[in-house]
Amino acid sequence: MDFLCYLHAGWDPLVRPAESTRPWMDATPESFAYRCLPLNIANAHGWEILSPCDAEAYWTGQSGPEAVIVKNAPGTQKQNAAVSLFGQGTVTFHIQALFRTPPGWDLFITGSPNRPKDGIMPLSGVVETDWSPYSFTMNWKFTRRNHRIKFQRGEPICFVFPVQRGALERMDPKVVDLEENPALEADYKAWSKSRDEFQANIASARSPAERWQKRYYRGVGMADEHPVADHRTRLRLKPFVAGEPAAEAVPTMTFDEAGLARIIGAATAAAREGATAAELAVALARAGVPGGAAARLAAACGEDAEQTLPAPSSYGRGPG
């Protein structure tokens, strides 16, 4: 799938596949923090956008934009400068890129995972980058007043990764007693017992290897089997490279009679409840319409879903 980064004239974003390393993890004894595979995967689970300049900011504690005093390094170009734009103790970076994800995919925008910065924190957002022609900003919020922070050129200021729109809404969360899954319960109890024994003996371990159970890291179950074929111990994301503009893909929608009835029913129910276009899009996505198509169908109904819905045939009885 293409993940595109469109550049306007004069834009030159510093974007790279995220690093799995962190200075604080390097500093742990024997770098033991890297034995935590979930940390490693999260660290590299996207692309980092780096600060284009050196900047310093100070927050007086007031709510207005003037309460954040930002000083950029001499010679910093205007489009690269950190600014105080929104108030509320925030520092803003304009991201010089227009990302385009495949149909039905959003972009999760946040700070680099497991990379704390004293006195300030990254804010997170989700943008529908499969259709939006709008750029976005990356914002950091002070966590205490009368505090000075610095951003260095080349420091990660933004972290992005695509997420499939509607996937969360299609999840059916359920609480189930563990005893209803005897195999899982047996494996859990065996692991819990082995973990207790391991923790009791860890102080007498003679080597680093003896202080690491490593079952999850190796993707091995309690019967020494490999439950999944696509277990990963690292991510290998591709860098952005020069390429030809891709044509906007149009998702193919194929529904049987039951699926079509479900979609029309969801749209009708949403309209009766006075749903907004955004709420209608969610209802359509839950009914099985791909995210990008759901947004377009909802938009076709106008800002208020009580307006006339598209004819059933426009929902795609077959390919198209």
What do the PLM-derived regions correspond to, one by one?
Residues 1-132, 147-150, 155-254:
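Non-catalytic terminal segments and appended small domains
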Residues 30, 133-142:
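Short, structured beta-strand/loop micro-motifs enriched in basic residues and often containing a Trp
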Residues 149-152, 278, 292:
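Short, solvent-exposed positions on alpha-helices
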Residues 249, 262-263, 288:
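Generic short N-terminal amphipathic or hydrophobic helices
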Residues 255-283:
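Eukaryotic low-complexity, mixed-charge intrinsically disordered interaction/regulatory segments enriched
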Residues 284-287, 291-309:
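Short, charged early-sequence alpha-helical segments and their helix-coil boundaries
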Residues 313-314:
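Serine residues within intrinsically disordered or low-complexity segments
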Residues 317-318:
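Glycine-biased, low-complexity coil/linker segments
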